[in-house]
Each structure stands twice: as C-alpha cells, then as structure tokens.
From Swiss-Prot:
Tissue-wise expression: Mainly expressed on apical surfaces of the mammary epithelial cells.
Transmembrane segments annotated in the record for this chain: 233-253
Gene: MUC15
Entry keywords, A to Z: Cell membrane, Glycoprotein, Membrane, Secreted, Signal, Transmembrane, Transmembrane helix
GO cellular component, one term: extracellular region
Free-text description of this protein's post-translational modifications in UniProt: Highly glycosylated (N- and O-linked carbohydrates).
Residues on Extracellular side: 24-232
Endpoints of the signal sequence: 1-23
Descriptive protein name: Mucin-15
Organism: Bos taurus (Bovine)
A Pfam family reported for this protein in Swiss-Prot or TrEMBL: Mucin15
Compositionally skewed regions (Polar residues) per UniProt: 42-56, 86-115, 292-310
Chain residue ranges for the region called Disordered: 23-115, 164-185, 279-330
Record topological domains on the Cytoplasmic side: 254-330
Length: 330
C-alpha cells in the first residue's frame, strides 16, 4: 500500500511539473511574439521633425551639457530596445511564476513604471526631470482560473513645440495566461504506460512481526544456557530415579515372596517316601467285584475270599464268545 501511494504521488507531481513547463513555454513564445511586433511597429512609425539641422544641433548640445544623460535620448534605438526588453522580461517573470508557489502578485516598485520625459529641443537635458506618467501595470489574479493579465505600457515624450511623439507597446492580443488547477478525485488508475518513466524502489523499512523464532540469537543472554542445562539435568535425574526405584521395589518384593513360598505347602513331600502308597484299597468296607480279569494286582486277599465263596474261577483273559460276529456288507 505504501509503495503504490508513493508511486501515485510521484506521478501527480510529475504531471504538474510538465503542465507548468508547457505553460512557461507558451508564455515565453507569446512574449517573444509581442516583443517582435512592438519592434516592427517602432521601426515603421515616422517621427515628424522640424529640420535635420536642428535635430543634430540639439543632440550635440545635449551630449556636451550632460554626457551621462545622452544614453536616454529618444533617437538611440538601442536604448528603446533595452527598455522594451526590460518590460518584456518583467512580464515574462510575472507570468512565468508557478501559481502554486505565488498565488498573488505584489505591485512592482515605481522604478519599473513607464515614464514621460519632457525633452526640449533647445535646452539641456539637465534642466528636465523624469515624471511618472502612467499607473503601474495592472496585474489581475483571479483565484478560480489564475489568469495573469498584463496591461499595455505607454511611453509618451512631449516636445515644447506642441508636437507629441507617442510610442505605445500594444500587443496584437491580450497576453493572458490561464492556468487551470488540477483536481484529482480518488486514486487514478496506474497502467503500464504511465509507469514506464518511473523506477520502483523497494522499501527497506523493517516492519515488526509477531513471529519470533529464537530470541536468544537476537538478544543473547548469559543465564539462558545455564537454565536449559539445569532443566535437562532435572528431567534426566527424574527419569533415572524412577527406573532405579521401580527396580528396587521389584527386588524387595521378589525376596519377600520367595521366603513365604518356602514356608508353605510343597509337592515334594509326596515323593519323599516311595514305599508309602498314595491310594490304599485295603481299608475298603466292602469287597469289590474282582471277577473281571486278574484282580490280584489290586487286592490279593479279596481275590482269595471271592474264589472260595463264589466258586468262580478267575480268568486271566477277556472272554470273547459273547461278542456277535460282524455283519458283512452285501
């Protein structure tokens, strides 16, 4: 945003400068044309004189009486040209001023006003004095359009024989320079053509941001490394202490449980005496039926009593006569 605003301000200022330079060139050309026309009118005008001899004698008398005043003689064309150039330069200076810097113009000093010189033909120029004849040039400065109007300057020289010689600087047209103020409404659109004459400079202003990666690198502090090492040592010590405490508790629990198991019931007692039977059938209240197979392995005394009482012979083998034959498949 700031870069675009700067570019727009630079474009506006450059356009104002270009407009002012074109206005100055137009004023200079108008002033030059008016000065050339004034010189032509001065050359074309004829001066009625009484006689050539009187004119030359008066000129000699003026030069001998006041040599310094001879520079102001009317017949010297270079003097008049210098005066005309002075007024043209004055008008150029008045009109070429920038309206933005000098909105109002102050009246000029009386030395720049036009004057009337009474030069008698038969007397010295020292007896005469320069009298102001016309008002200062009218300078009109309207606020709305800022027009600078220069009035014509009349130089009148009177002779004692009631013959007047009038030289008037009348331009062909009013030397008016109108400068319209430039009004900018809103932000003008910038195109590629308008940006060709300008070089864009990148801003080097550092703007504060909210992202800070590492403050210790920008602002070094001697206490930060010690605090980091201290925190690391605390964490490592806590982890190591927890591991050692858990291992110690497990060892104590194992030792206590081992001692309790030795005092409790053990299955090894069953195998201490091999001769002691695990299950004895001699103490049975009723004798078992030992007719199936050889039951002497379990209770030989019961076997003897059963044979004497029942009269049945014990068979060592399993009888297979009662088993029906297998059916053959058809």
């Amino acid at each position: 945003m700031l870069t675009s605003a700067k570019i727009l301000l630079i474009s506006i200022l450059s356009s104002l400068l270009l407009f002012g330079s074109h206005g100055e060139e137009g004023q200079k050309t108008n002033t030059t044309e008016s000065t050339a026309e004034d010189l032509k009118t001065m050359e074309n005008q004829s001066v009625p004189l009484e006689s050539k001899a009187n004119l030359t004698s008066d000129k000699e008398n003026r030069e001998t009486s006041n040599p310094k005043a001879s520079n102001f003689s009317f017949e010297d064309p270079s003097n008049k040209t210098h005066e005309t150039g002075f007024y043209s330069n004055l008008s150029t200076d008045n009109s070429s001023r920038s309206p933005s810097l000098m909105p109002t113009l102050s009246p000029r000093s009386p030395s720049t006003h036009s004057f009337v010189s009474k030069l008698p033909w038969n007397s010295s120029i020292a007896d005469n004095s320069l009298l102001p004849a016309s008002a200062p040039p009218n300078t009109t400065v309207p606020v709305s359009s800022e027009n600078f109007t220069l009035s014509s300057i009349n130089d009148t020289m009177k002779a004692p024989d009631n013959s007047s010689i009038t030289v008037s600087n009348l331009p062909s047209g009013p030397n008016t320079t109108s400068v319209t103020p430039m009004v900018t409404e809103g932000w003008p659109t910038t195109t590629r053509e308008s940006m060709e004459g300008f070089t864009v400079y990148q801003e080097t202003t550092l703007h504060p941001t909210l992202k800070f990666t590492n403050n210790s690198k920008i602002f070094p502090n001697t206490s930060d490394p010690q605090e980091e090492n201290r925190n690391t040592g605390v964490v490592f010590g806590a982890i190591l202490g927890a591991i050692l405490g858990a291992s110690l508790l497990s060892l104590v629990g194992y030792l206590l449980c081992g001692k309790r198991k030795t005092d409790s019931f053990s299955h090894r007692r069953l195998y201490d005496d091999r001769n002691e039977p695990v299950l004895r059938l001699d103490n049975a209240p009723e004798p078992y039926d030992m007719s199936f197979g050889n039951s002497s392995y379990y209770n030989p005394t019961a076997n003897d009593s059963s044979t004497s009482a029942g009269g049945e012979n014990a068979h060592d083998s399993i009888p297979m006569d009662d088993i029906p034959p297998l059916r053959t498949s058809v």
